[in-house]
A protein has these predicted regions:
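Non-catalytic interaction/Regulatory regions outside core domains
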Residues: 2-8, 13-133
Length: 133
């Protein structure tokens, strides 16, 4: 019953946070395949978003090993999506392969912190035996 409740909570949260139109992106297609970093910022030039993108480029192999994808939504019209960021200029979410929110913050955290969180998860522990780098 707890998983059903978690699923309902996630769907409710996502309905509030994520725009109805995701440019054809349906998060269900990534369930059990990928972990997802979702970011929301006022615009594409937000300093935290830029820092995250730089850090992601520097850690490409680690991102691939953890099956991480990044989707960003902004209110500046560059993505064509309208989002609600709860009056915060930046929000980051980590969604696990099971579709549950594993981490949420209104401040940027280092990818190393997210990697450590991911690496502590049982599913990731199994995957680590087959890392590609």
């Amino acid at each position: 019953h707890e998983n059903i409740f978690s699923g309902i909570l996630l769907l409710s949260f996502m309905a509030i946070m994520i725009p109805k139109e995701l440019h054809g992106i349906e998060l269900n297609q990534y369930l059990w395949k990928n972990r997802i970093i979702l970011t929301f910022a006022d615009d594409e030039d937000h300093a935290d978003l830029i820092r995250l993108k730089v850090e992601m480029k520097e850690n490409n192999c680690e991102i691939l090993n953890r099956d991480l994808l990044h989707f960003h939504f902004s209110n500046d019209g560059k993505t064509g999506n309208e989002t609600t960021t709860n009056d915060q200029s930046f929000t980051i979410l980590l969604i696990g392969k099971d579709g549950e929110i594993k981490y949420e913050s209104n401040r940027l955290v280092s990818l190393i912190h997210l990697f450590e969180l991911i690496d502590s998860m049982p599913m990731r522990q199994d995957e680590m035996q087959h890392d590609r780098c």
